[in-house]
Curated annotation (Swiss-Prot):
Reactions that this protein is recorded to catalyse: echinenone + 2 AH2 + 2 O2 = canthaxanthin + 2 A + 3 H2O; all-trans-beta-carotene + 2 AH2 + 2 O2 = echinenone + 2 A + 3 H2O
Pfam families the UniProt entry points to: FA_desaturase
Function: Involved in the biosynthesis of ketocarotenoids which are powerful anti-oxidative molecules. Catalyzes the conversion of beta-carotene to canthaxanthin via echinenone.
Organism: Haematococcus lacustris
Enzyme class: oxidoreductase
EC number(s) stated in the UniProt entry for this protein: 1.14.99.63
Protein name (Swiss-Prot/TrEMBL): Beta-carotene 4-ketolase 3
Secretion signal, residue range per the UniProt entry: none
Keyword Oxidoreductase: yes
Length: 320
């Protein structure tokens, strides 16, 4: 499909579902529109994207992720039986009698599948929180929007929603500025030091206290400590790295050279993935379509592929 044809189809669909301009005006009084200080911001595209005409899909998406995560989490914590010795290892599901001979442990295939799905759903919890910080779960109901964001980030790792909200908008208002953007590196753009500084800037003793309380509650309800370490610690940590790598490091990474540590990576320099829509979703719920996210910060995650087609950036060959 040619880019022009794709744009015409997308624009017609957008116009049909367009919301009142009052919605965007109300949004702009609570959040921040991006800077238009460079031609690279492509100011002509400022009004190309129209948000959904209803909050129903955003709310449904959020509730679906919360509900699915809850079901998989409870299964992982209370029903998975992790092996405690090499003798209990088995790759494929077996009969109940054979499982008892193996100490009742779950198969490695079962454990791996649950871990992979749960880690992906942890990522979905954070992406939903991120949408809440942009007001895009429910554009027309700020209280419901923030309630859902609070629920998601508490289930994710008990981060402080208000603190995340404040720092995230510091990121949008000072994108790629060392010392001003809390998501940016602190002078060393290497992957490991950047990730370490990124995570440490959002953690707190109060968060760890709440995580410890939550772990105690789970144990009192019968959850094995090993399950908590695998499914309540390792899974969200891996999810955090996924979010950082595809949503911060790759989009905002400075170019090579001796001045890399001092380069300003303004929002309009953000990179956008060339992955297909399906791969972009599986990678990080479209968080890798990052130029579009900064161009239209009032677009929910599930409309970022549409935004990419509007922008014409990062299109895969099939759409070029």
């Amino acid at each position: 499909m040619h880019v022009a044809s794709a744009l015409m189809v997308e624009q017609k669909g957008s116009e049909a579902a367009a919301s009142s301009p009052d919605v965007l005006r109300a949004w702009a009084t609570q959040y921040h529109m991006p800077s238009e200080s460079s031609d690279a911001a492509r100011p002509a595209l400022k009004h190309a994207y129209k948000p959904p005409a209803s909050d129903a899909k955003g709310i449904t998406m959020a509730l679906t992720i919360i509900g699915t995560w809850t079901a998989v989490f409870l299964h992982a914590i209370f029903q998975i039986r992790l092996p405690t010795s090499m003798d209990q290892l088995h790759w494929l599901p077996v009969s109940e009698a054979t499982a008892q001979l193996l100490g009742g442990s779950s198969s490695l295939l079962h454990i791996a599948a649950v871990f992979i799905v749960l880690e992906f759903l942890y990522t979905g919890l954070f992406i939903t929180t991120h949408d809440a910080m942009h007001g895009t779960i429910a554009l027309r109901n700020r209280q419901l929007n923030d309630l859902l964001g609070n629920i998601c980030i508490s289930l994710y790792a008990w981060f402080d929603y208000s603190m995340l909200h404040r720092k995230h908008w510091e990121h949008h208002n000072h994108t790629g500025e060392v010392g001003k953007d809390p998501d940016f590196h602190k002078g060393n753009p290497g992957l490991v030091p950047w990730f370490a500084s990124f995570m440490s800037s959002y953690m707190s003793l109060w968060q760890f206290a709440r995580l410890a309380w939550w772990a105690v509650v789970m144990q009192m309800l019968g959850a094995p400590m090993a399950n908590l370490l695998v499914f309540m610690a390792a899974a969200p940590i891996l999810s955090a790295f996924r979010l950082f790598y595809f949503g911060t490091y790759l989009p905002h990474k400075p170019g090579p050279g001796p001045a890399a540590g001092s380069q300003v990576m303004a929002w309009f320099r953000a990179k956008t993935s060339e992955a297909s829509d399906v791969m972009s979703f599986l990678t990080c719920y479209h968080f890798d379509l990052h130029w579009e996210h900064h161009r239209w910060p009032f677009a929910p995650w599930w409309q970022l592929p549409h935004c990419r087609r509007l922008s014409g950036r990062g299109l895969v060959p099939a759409l070029a």
